[in-house]
Amino acid sequence: MSWSISSNQLNIENLLNEESLFFTGNGYIGVRGNFEEKYYDGASSIRGTYINAFHDITDINYGEKLYAFPETQQKLVNVIDAQTVQIYFGEEEERFSLFEGEVIQYERHLHMDKGFSERVIHWRSPGGKEVKLKFKRLTSFIYKELFIQEITIEPVNFFGKTKVVSTVNGDVSNFVDPSDPRVGSGHAKLLTVSDTVIEGDFVSIETKTKRSNLYAACTSTCRLNIDFQREYVKNEKSVETVLTFELTEKAIMTKINIYTDTLRHGDRPLRTGLDLCQKLSCLTFNDLKEQQKHYLDKFWLYADVEISGDQALQEGIRFNLFHLLQSAGRDRFSNIAAKGLSGEGYEGHYFWDTEIYMVPVFLMTNPELAKQLLIYRYSILDKARERAREMGHRKGALFPWRTISGGECSSYFPAGTAQYHISADIAYSYVQYYLVTKDLDFLKSYGAELLIETARLWMDTGHYHEGKFKIDAVTGPDEYTCIVNNNYYTNVMAKHNLRWAAKSVAELEKHAPDTLASLKAKLEITDEEIAEWIKAAEAMYLPYDPTLNINPQDDTFLQKQVWDFDNTPKEHYPLLLHYHPLTLYRYQVCKQADTVLAHFLLEDEQDESVIRDSYHYYEKITTHDSSLSSCVFSIMAAKIGELDKAYEYFIETARLDLDNTHGNTKDGLHMANMGGTWMAIVYGFAGLRIKESGLSLAPVIPKQWQSYRFSIQYLGRHISVSVDTKGTKVNLLNGEELTIKLYGKKHQLTKDEPLEITFNNGRVD
């Protein structure tokens, strides 16, 4: 049923990718799928364990630095390594390694319904000693600090002295690749070991970042199910626990690791972690596996998408949803990085990806988790205000293009700070959350203030010209076209932001007048200012070309030459690695969906013919060099009725990391694309939309499938949607009846009467 991904052969060329694919995490910590015993000398590996939002500060070096360029950036830190376990057999101490001796059997699995990974191995040493080994690991969703390993050693023809060396190592570095702008360069060594402690059966290491003054600690303890001797080897930066025993029967070693840091655990993370490890050390792997299964049963009840007709795509969608869950921050300090907790690509920064591509998944399947992701943005609102002032704005909030703790980390402003649309993207996500939940407390505590401050940014950025409100010198989502006037995406999202700032005031006036009075006083809001938001939204200039019947990406986009795609070698993609930015800026060539994305998010701003013609125009000139693109084109192809094309794009998005189609899975998984896979099904094939008027659906089914099914949460209801070649069925599984739109017509949905619509030759009459 595609609940696992597996690797059944040891492929040296794919080990780096598998480190990302088989990572385990829980939103707080992420552990790459490295081998406990490591590889061979000289082998490439990105050995990593990460704590969400745990970062250091590094300088940004410029050849020429101008006003308001960020001076420093935050960088996700590779923290203490507790994965390592070496095993030695016999008096001569033959070390277990998959790269020596003979591998008789090798299997590797990530169980997405149970929440753990394992390796199953049958190995013969160079000296002929034969054993079976099983390595299991689990990062707990119940105890966020806990990462547990279980190693089973079963004798086949060898019985005798065995030594297991478990290491906790604070001498770790970050991965760097100066040749790839998508990976960090320089600043590899970010941690220093501040303390090593052995207390009873527990070993601890505490480390400190160089400049952010954050501490991270790891406490570890090991136990065996048979008699053994224990000793310790304490070094300056690591501690080894050495377990020696006679292997006469199956031996099972359990290693419990607890991670803590100053952001969540105060100024004594080592002591806190040690106490917690002592408290949890009685837990077995099976105990935690059972708890993990219970947690995931609830997650999959709401989040699972079932596809009948394509096993590979079924595997892909579950894989993507599971890794999104493993990477989603659950506190005010954290969010979802571009690579989640699976790797160091983009240095662990949070982008607009979260709000536009990832929040929708949780919004419709786990609204409480979506809420936590949005609260993170509110927690850095003051820093966004500071950034706006730094950028010359008298009012408003400008959110950083890439960040961890709230400061701008982008050193290349044309494709960074200039992407002002991120503030409107966050506002859009806040509005979607409110429409799906009607959470008035959220609007009172977070939503209205953020919507108002982002609206103020547009009023100070834009200006009126010939009766239209225009926004100059910005960059839209397409990073091959920078610093333009009136980017369609930016303008239409700003329009939405301005409208909803005014609507949020109206909502509070109606439902929470006391809160509104306090907010008006705090932010010094006047009725005249609110009226200006409405006026600017109504006057917003949205570029339109009547000859082509499309929305131009910006004021000058159509004046440029079209890129010579026919004579661009395949090996020159992605273009950003082979052409100077100015070269790209001079042509009509898109890295990713821009105007097409705007037509998805705010489809009511244009009629169907403009959306269709724009899709066809931009499809010809979009490279999809960004992993954020294919899912959007899939959604919009489905909308305009081009199902075969929608399916082609969906295939690309569903297995992008599993098949490493972008060639950089080793640096971490593409989290936005993972959210996009779900969106391509639910927003694309099923046609789901959330608007002020309510929830609407218009499902279609690709000819390659027999059926598909998913469920959503909406206004406290649990709704399932099933689609097959015969038609569509919508069930209300829990909650009060409500009105929804199905294929453009209003229907009352009740528990007793599912809505069923029959297809006629694959279409609705």
Swiss-Prot record:
One of its GO terms (molecular function) is hydrolase activity, hydrolyzing O-glycosyl compounds. Keywords: Glycosyltransferase, Transferase. The keyword Heme does not apply. It comes from the Bacteria. Its EC number is 2.4.1.64. Optimum temperature is 75 degrees Celsius. The keyword Glycosyltransferase applies. Optimum pH is 7.0-8.0. Substrate binds at residues 352-353, 591-592. GO terms for biological process: trehalose catabolic process. The active site is at 479 (proton donor). It catalyses: alpha,alpha-trehalose + phosphate = beta-D-glucose 1-phosphate + D-glucose. Pathway: Glycan degradation; trehalose degradation. Pfam families: Glyco_hydro_65C, Glyco_hydro_65m, Glyco_hydro_65N. Catalyzes the reversible phosphorolytic cleavage of trehalose. Phosphorolysis is specific for trehalose. Homodimer. Belongs to the glycosyl hydrolase 65 family. This is Alpha,alpha-trehalose phosphorylase. It comes from Geobacillus stearothermophilus.
